Amino acid sequence: KTGLKAAGVFAGLVAMDGFHLSNAVLDELGRRNRKGAPDTFDVEGYLATLDRVRADGAPQVFAPTYRRDLHESVAAGSIVSGTGVVVTEGNYLALETRGWGAARERIDLLIHIDVPEEVLVLRLINRHEEFGKNPLAAGHWVRTVDLPNARLIATSVHRCDEVWREPEDEPESGVVDDDTADDL
């Protein structure tokens, strides 16, 4: 083995999805019909968590997670502690608007994974159906919420350090193979 694993360095995960505003708050703000848009996340909470995790000698940091089966965030759903490396993922990490620009400043290496739109649409519809939407509702959500968000994300790709493109001939395969994963 090579890379971080071989050096005994382990990575913690802080997923942006854990910072979805609750459905009750989204209802109160009138944003639930756009859940997943940049302003439906607690960006300030996300930034504060990144700051806590990145601090030298950081103790255990409890980070929220997202449960798709519940369609809700779960407070303190994961523990991130003195790992030395923190992996974070999310759609809006390269955006320059509404606080997201500060997220980019906290990320040492930002990678955008580029997926052809037709593949993205199929994956999103399948995911929505898997978690309870009927095919018509899933397609509507993808067209009216997810695709506009994806197009917004595409406007900020220039702020990423790298762009990984999924092979055209293997649209359902992942972008990281076993050899690449061993180097992480």
At which residue positions do the language-model features occur?
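The start of beta-strands in P-loop NTPase/AAA+ ATPase cores
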Residues: F10-G12, G84
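Conserved nucleotide-sensing/catalytic segment adjacent to the nucleotide-binding pocket
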Residues: G12-A15, L21-R67
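Short glycine-/polar-rich loops that comprise or flank the Walker A/P-loop
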Residues: V9, E105-L109, V157-D161
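Conserved beta-strand scaffold positions in the cores of enzyme catalytic domains, especially
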Residues: L13, L110-H112, V163
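Alpha-helical scaffold elements adjacent to nucleotide-binding pockets in ATP/GTP-utilizing enzyme cores
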Residues: G45, T49, L120-R127, W141
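ATP-dependent NMP and nucleoside kinases share a basic, alpha-helical "lid"
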Residues: L70-R127
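Small-molecule kinase domains that catalyze NTP-dependent phosphoryl transfer to phosphate-bearing small molecules
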Residues: R98-G101, N126-D177, L184
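A conserved segment at the C-terminal end of the G1
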Residues: K1-G8
